[in-house]
């Protein structure tokens, strides 16, 4: 036990001062339970009844090894103690009694900070009951150790609690230890024996090492790779796997679309069958089911498996690798195979590649390969001689079915296939009589007379070809005009090439070529239908445009006809009066004539006589011309007398009577002349209108003076 005594006499005085100032422990002594002067909260000293720290004992002579951390100096009051000496002694004791290890952040309790929660604040506690000097000393002595308030001075220092408050849930020191131990164990596991090191030292060679670099192309991601390692990493990578999942989903959607198209076609066929059944022209058809197509169809399963939709779906769902001669259950397995090292090696050896190389390759088929595709008719077994009559009946039925095939098509063929299967079943039952059984050749199918057997450039295919399609016959060639020679023989329908003419001839009799030929004819027929529809639509459009033009021209023609009829009835419109200037000129002339015609006015009699004489001369000329025109019109008539009598007498008064009214009105204001002229035109009697055809006949010979004079009658 090491004790240091510094200036004992002042210490005693401090104790006495602490007795006096004991009641000032906690700012007004409002909370006596937290009195730092003594009692149960006697920090740094033994538990005793002297609550004011009356024991004459050095503050550093404590049983607590860490007594220097807080000590009894928390009970010290007043400013007589030398602050520097206390700080020096406090730091000295801390360095002596603390752990000998260098300070580390891992030793901090819980939160690891200098100011934790309220119960974890370290350093010398500030005694609020003491004087100002003690508080100053405690503030300057913050470098002391950290201790929990709950620890008693007599007992040993408790270890810091683990898992306390704050952000850290585990002690950082323990966590670091566990991590180091874990890494050490892993390193021990990875370290093999020296003998094993020599075996595993060489790295594994990539399975794509023997594949040429130009073959490293991923057709799913459409990416080119530069070497074997990069290609292998791409195949195992996340991007490639995600792309593969998306393409697999697209394959599923496309397969469903093909199935839906087949279902729609079958529904249309069933509707047609129902219609024929209602009309009494067809009997009930039996439905069958295809698992791959997920389809209920009319006919036999063997006929359905040869149909275009079934073969298309089968080729899509179960592709075949030509280079490796392998078939796959799903298309995604086929894609995986195309990226395998085995396939790429064979593709490089055969100088073929998926994509560009495969398109550039020209495979030429031989006679042996094409002979494999010939489909010979299956022979049926015939029962013994005892049942010759039944066999003859069966042949008759079969011939009848063959005759009906031209009309009913694939359905009759399906029935024939069913009959063939029934006959085969009957023969199986009599296998014991093999000696008496004989084989009978199947009769070749009968084609319609006008069936299509060939197509040349320029030939027209009709829109309806269902009744003109030939049946398959392995002894007859179809479409030989579609096979041309190009240093070899090419079939444009099947896109295949052959080495000799014999091979081409055999190919024209194969089932694949026959199926492609029927597909080609149907496509041409649909093209013809489309062309006909387009031509009909063009004709209809032209007719519609013509009708629209005629409808637009009809009102104009009607208006012109009405104008001509009005001109024939009477010349009520003068072209010279179309503008306002002509009307003004005529109005001035009317005023002048009205002034000349006025009688009984206040003007001089000499002027009236002159004007009257001029007017009379003009009227005489007009009457003479009207009489000539009327005579010209009346010459073809048999009775000219009744028409001549009213003509010379009546036109003169209407010209004079309305002319008197505007003369009186023209004297005060010349503006009233148009109204007067209008009244004169309206007041003209009907005989003047009857004389208008004569004026129309003589209109070409009329003088300008006469035109102005006539303006009063036909102005409006």
UniProtKB/Swiss-Prot annotation:
<feature type="short sequence motif" description="Nuclear localization signal">
    <location>
        <begin position="379"/>
        <end position="383"/>
    </location>
</feature>
<feature type="compositionally biased region" description="Pro residues">
    <location>
        <begin position="639"/>
        <end position="656"/>
    </location>
</feature>
<keyword id="KW-0539">Nucleus</keyword>
<dbReference type="GO" id="GO:0003727">
    <property type="term" value="F:single-stranded RNA binding"/>
</dbReference>
<feature type="compositionally biased region" description="Acidic residues">
    <location>
        <begin position="432"/>
        <end position="447"/>
    </location>
</feature>
<feature type="zinc finger region" description="C2H2-type 3">
    <location>
        <begin position="319"/>
        <end position="343"/>
    </location>
</feature>
<dbReference type="GO" id="GO:0003697">
    <property type="term" value="F:single-stranded DNA binding"/>
</dbReference>
<keyword id="KW-0597">Phosphoprotein</keyword>
<feature type="compositionally biased region" description="Basic and acidic residues">
    <location>
        <begin position="415"/>
        <end position="431"/>
    </location>
</feature>
<dbReference type="InterPro" id="IPR013087">
    <property type="entry name" value="Znf_C2H2_type"/>
</dbReference>
<keyword id="KW-0158">Chromosome</keyword>
<feature type="region of interest" description="Disordered">
    <location>
        <begin position="350"/>
        <end position="447"/>
    </location>
</feature>
<feature type="modified residue" description="Phosphothreonine">
    <location>
        <position position="692"/>
    </location>
</feature>
<feature type="compositionally biased region" description="Basic and acidic residues">
    <location>
        <begin position="541"/>
        <end position="551"/>
    </location>
</feature>
<feature type="compositionally biased region" description="Low complexity">
    <location>
        <begin position="657"/>
        <end position="704"/>
    </location>
</feature>
<feature type="short sequence motif" description="Nuclear localization signal">
    <location>
        <begin position="544"/>
        <end position="548"/>
    </location>
</feature>
<feature type="compositionally biased region" description="Basic and acidic residues">
    <location>
        <begin position="188"/>
        <end position="203"/>
    </location>
</feature>
<dbReference type="InterPro" id="IPR026811">
    <property type="entry name" value="CIZ1"/>
</dbReference>
<dbReference type="GO" id="GO:0005694">
    <property type="term" value="C:chromosome"/>
</dbReference>
<feature type="region of interest" description="Disordered">
    <location>
        <begin position="182"/>
        <end position="208"/>
    </location>
</feature>
<keyword id="KW-0238">DNA-binding</keyword>
<feature type="modified residue" description="Phosphoserine">
    <location>
        <position position="206"/>
    </location>
</feature>
<dbReference type="InterPro" id="IPR036236">
    <property type="entry name" value="Znf_C2H2_sf"/>
</dbReference>
<keyword id="KW-0862">Zinc</keyword>
<feature type="modified residue" description="Phosphoserine">
    <location>
        <position position="201"/>
    </location>
</feature>
<feature type="modified residue" description="Phosphothreonine">
    <location>
        <position position="203"/>
    </location>
</feature>
<feature type="modified residue" description="Phosphoserine">
    <location>
        <position position="686"/>
    </location>
</feature>
<dbReference type="GO" id="GO:0071013">
    <property type="term" value="C:catalytic step 2 spliceosome"/>
</dbReference>
<dbReference type="GO" id="GO:0048024">
    <property type="term" value="P:regulation of mRNA splicing, via spliceosome"/>
</dbReference>
<feature type="zinc finger region" description="C2H2-type 1">
    <location>
        <begin position="216"/>
        <end position="240"/>
    </location>
</feature>
<dbReference type="Pfam" id="PF23330">
    <property type="entry name" value="zf-C2H2_14"/>
</dbReference>
<feature type="region of interest" description="Disordered">
    <location>
        <begin position="534"/>
        <end position="716"/>
    </location>
</feature>
<dbReference type="GO" id="GO:0003677">
    <property type="term" value="F:DNA binding"/>
</dbReference>
<feature type="compositionally biased region" description="Basic and acidic residues">
    <location>
        <begin position="386"/>
        <end position="401"/>
    </location>
</feature>
<dbReference type="InterPro" id="IPR056345">
    <property type="entry name" value="Znf-C2H2_CIZ1"/>
</dbReference>
<dbReference type="GO" id="GO:0000398">
    <property type="term" value="P:mRNA splicing, via spliceosome"/>
</dbReference>
<feature type="compositionally biased region" description="Acidic residues">
    <location>
        <begin position="405"/>
        <end position="414"/>
    </location>
</feature>
<feature type="modified residue" description="Phosphoserine">
    <location>
        <position position="673"/>
    </location>
</feature>
<dbReference type="GO" id="GO:0005634">
    <property type="term" value="C:nucleus"/>
</dbReference>
<feature type="modified residue" description="Phosphoserine">
    <location>
        <position position="684"/>
    </location>
</feature>
<comment type="function">
    <text>May play a role in the process of early and late gene activation, or possibly in RNA processing, for a defined set of developmentally regulated loci.</text>
</comment>
<keyword id="KW-0677">Repeat</keyword>
